[in-house]
């Protein structure tokens, strides 16, 4: 079936990738992901109306709380070509206005700055509206 073929292709790709980067390379990729995630969170919580939901160790994802509904913020970011994260409110009603964000080793400091700048603009304009 297609599902089995797709699984086989993904396993093959992952095996090739891990064999190329090796244990040391995989550790470096993980460390870079953690670093980029920390940089992303630091940049985003500096935006007025954004705060960290949980002050716990994390790998490459974090939950942020916004002072307004996440859906509108994500729509405004999407209009700027930015996939801003995942609105958690539908799956976790107790986390209203919660946004799941992620950064990996593939994100650059410029990507993070662009996201933070766009989020700051969206939050400021939404407050003025």
Could you tell me what each predicted segment is?
Residues 64, 71, 80, 87, ...:
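Hydrophobic, small-residue-rich alpha-helical packing segments that form membrane-like cores
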Residues 28, 32, 36, 85-88, ...:
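Membrane-embedded transmembrane-helix bundle of lipid-linked glycan/lipid transferases
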Residues 3-12, 33, 74-93:
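Flexible glycine/proline-rich, aromatic-decorated loop/lid segments
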Residues 49-80:
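Conserved PLP-binding catalytic core of the aspartate aminotransferase-like
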Residues 1-48, 52-55:
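Active-site C-terminal subdomain of aminotransferase-like
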Residues 76, 90-129:
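PLP-dependent enzyme catalytic core of the Aspartate aminotransferase-like
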Residues 20, 24-27, 36-38, 60-62, ...:
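Flexible loop/turn segments at secondary-structure boundaries
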